[in-house]
Amino acid sequence: MISFIIPCYNEEKHIRECIRSIKSNIQYIQYEIIVVDNNCSDDTAKIANEEQVTVIEEKRKGVVFARQAGYENAKGDLIANIDADSKITKGWVWVALKQILNDDVIAVTGPLEYENSSSSLKLLTKIFYWAANISNKYVGVFLQGGNSMIKKSALDAVNGYDLNIAFYGEDTMTAKRIQHLGKIVFEPDLISISSPRRINEQGLVKTIWLYLINYLSVTFKGKSLTNDYKDHR
């Protein structure tokens, strides 16, 4: 059984499409969708309920707390982490299962593609994920937090997520904590289409810099450098 976990903070503009992209991918597979209401003040929970999925609340603000709440309530043996402002692409589930059902694989992750992105952003995104794939093989493990599937047994072995990292680097820390249990595969065909809102509002250079320095810090020092983050809605 696959448990799809979607952390949400005021995602009324995106959550319906996100949920429906998951449902359209499911055939002949047991699954559940858990939307984690992380202090929403809009209609996110109402819309999720209309879509007939499980909605739970997590009052501690932050994506890592929402992921942990989803994991603790999940019934499946596979945990799929999906960002609320994303839509998984056709065939996503089967691409993920092809990798993660191997005995030596504990997690699979893939790239994000951004809606209505410029040619320069598309090029930089391709370069980023090329570098991420190289890093995953030779430097440090790479995990795209909002576009991944993890065996629940691997998370059970480390008691879930590290709650000391609020945002930047939380996915890298997850990868770092479970990597001794098996392989983490970067699968280029495991694509999720995401909103570019953070890049648009924060700027491309700053966004890349913040993710890069925190990835390196968590990989080599075991801690994040940036504790503060801004919600972009």
Question: Which residues fall in each region the model found?
Answer:
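Acidic donor-binding loop at a coil-to-helix junction in glycosyltransferase catalytic cores
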Residues: 167-174
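Short, flexible, basic/aromatic active-site loop/helix in glycosyltransferases
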Residues: 109-117, 121-145
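Short, acidic, metal-binding catalytic loop of nucleotide-sugar glycosyltransferases
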Residues: 20-30
